[in-house]
């Protein structure tokens, strides 16, 4: 039988090797049906129709090739798969370095847990205390222990967080987020005076002050209100519930939403506001 007759009845999503297999099987079924019709002429004439041949082909072969049942690989749409061994950060555009435990061991062996004993803090002056908070690698001084701890991470060759676009490493999620936005083009902070937008809020504030003469209500180094940013499209909102509703509806398969749902299952007693502190 001509393939132009039966191919539309089966479907167009077939590979060339599948067509040759089907052609051979239909040819065999055609010969079988002719021999049966000669032995039993009382059967209806429509039994030799094209539809009957296709039905016989499907009935006689209980296990057709897998490529027939499944669509062509070119037509298949891959579903999002997240490796459980990899922990995503920054909305899925960064991952935690699997070698992060080695980084922690490096810091504990390279940095003393306490550079100054409590007794010496009482007797020593403020200048002596500030001198003690000095990076032993580059000599930079800090006023707070947490600032020294944060600075010392930049000297490590192993980075805690890796960019999923280029593999560049960072030890701070803020630096990772600022970097990945150069790949995605997300500029969530938009100027209301003009059409410019920026990847960081500090850049927007600097633009408003220098270009438009807008003074800010925040003091120097005063903490700003939290803004939740969708790293997929740049949508922003100050309320986590609204932000969560956005990624649930617009980006239901994003790594950010999948990470939140996983944390919600593990911490069912926690409220969404509490989960927002550990999911982002």
UniProtKB/Swiss-Prot annotation:
PROSITE patterns, alphabetized: ZINC_FINGER_C2H2_1, ZINC_FINGER_C2H2_2
GO terms of molecular function: DNA-binding transcription factor activity; DNA-binding transcription factor activity, RNA polymerase II-specific; RNA polymerase II cis-regulatory region sequence-specific DNA binding; zinc ion binding
InterPro entries: Ovo-like, Znf_C2H2_sf, Znf_C2H2_type
GO biological process: animal organ morphogenesis; epidermal cell differentiation; hindgut morphogenesis; nematode male tail tip morphogenesis; regulation of DNA-templated transcription; regulation of transcription by RNA polymerase II; response to salt stress
Entry keywords, A to Z: Metal-binding, Nucleus, Repeat, Zinc, Zinc-finger
ZnF bounds (C2H2-type): 133-155, 161-183, 189-212, 228-251
Subcellular location: Nucleus
GO cellular component: a single term: nucleus
Miscellaneous comment in the UniProt entry for this protein: Differences in the regulation of lin-48 expression may explain, at least in part, differences in excretory duct morphology and function between C.elegans and the related species C.briggsae.
Function: Transcription factor. Involved in development of the hindgut, the male tail, and the excretory duct cell. Involved in modulating function of excretory duct cells. Plays a role in left/right patterning of cell fates in the hindgut.
Protein name: Transcription factor ovo-like homolog lin-48
Gene this chain is encoded by: lin-48
